[in-house]
Amino acid sequence: VYGYIKIPMKYMSDIVDSAVFQRLRRIIQTSYSPLYSSAVHNRFVHSLGVYYLGTIAAKNVERELENITEMKKEDIHHLGEIFELACLLHDVGHAPFSHTGEKLYLSDDLKYNQIHKLLVDEVDTKSFTKDIEHYAGKCAAPHEIMSAIVGIRAFPNHIVKAGDKEFFARCIT
């Protein structure tokens, strides 16, 4: 649909080639694949497409922000990179069988609120904790929360500056 998608080498070798990301090839995106048997509808291809659209959005926001804010250009660009990373990794927390398997995250021994606590512990900022406690169960789906956790834990070399974890998690959830 989008033609060739350019992905920086640092993302290709560290993220796209990782087992965490490659498993998305085996998670079906939609249940319509029997209707279009030659189409590829998996979370891997979907995530690459979301990344591509995210790069377009980030560049446009970056250009607009440069005209209306006093933030340094490098800081604006860095936030754009974190947003793009969140776009790429937004589905890495999917359970097997995609949304059908999401109920696994809500079983008796791992309550929904415990998933929120895992994310709060991972991000570890007062503002994020306050927002999660206020909105818990009202906004993010379990796979989105797990995607933020998996992204932060699996790719710490890409989420390093102060505030990166929080911004990354907010982009996904």
Spans of model-derived segments:
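Sequence-structural signature of the catalytic-core scaffold of metal-dependent phosphohydrolases
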Residues: V1-T30, P34-L85, A95-T173
